[in-house]
């Protein structure tokens, strides 16, 4: 059942060393799910994975939260992964620097860069365009939002 929840049922009998990094992470998450937790804490679950593996893990985690109602605490340095969160907490040296929705946090491009974090590319581009005089909303954080704003 847990393997099915993370899309790994077809690999139940595969040797673990033949799985990709993303598949191994999904199997590890399935192991956690078998315990039926109310909350899962994932610390850098996509570290050392290729972009496809990262997408697989983010998709799996979103599904666990939305479909199974499991609370996810997701620690990452990849700001594009944090876009999928309901709430983002930015910490610096063990202290909360700021928190809010992804729009509230990632619209603070300059503040993020000051503490060594990169905002999503769309937020950075929108910020630079605003600095050059182009009128754009301050809460643009995704590629789709940026494209839509530029086409108006």
What residues fall within each predicted segment?
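Conserved ABC ATPase "signature" region
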Residues: 1-11
């Amino acid at each position: 059942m847990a393997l099915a929840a993370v899309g790994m049922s077809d690999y139940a009998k595969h040797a673990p060393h033949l799985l990709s990094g993303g598949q191994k992470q999904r199997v590890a998450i399935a192991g956690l799910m078998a315990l039926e937790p109310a909350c899962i804490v994932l610390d850098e679950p996509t570290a050392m994975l290729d972009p496809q593996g990262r997408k697989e893990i983010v998709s799996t985690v979103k599904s666990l939260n939305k479909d199974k109602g499991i609370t996810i605490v997701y620690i990452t340095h990849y700001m594009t992964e944090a876009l999928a969160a309901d709430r983002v907490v930015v910490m610096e040296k063990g202290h909360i620097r700021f928190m809010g929705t992804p729009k509230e946090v990632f619209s603070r491009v300059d503040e993020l860069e000051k503490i060594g974090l990169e905002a999503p590319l769309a937020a950075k581009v929108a910020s630079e365009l605003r600095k050059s005089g182009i009128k754009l909303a301050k809460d643009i954080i995704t590629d789709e939002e940026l494209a839509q704003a530029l086409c108006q």
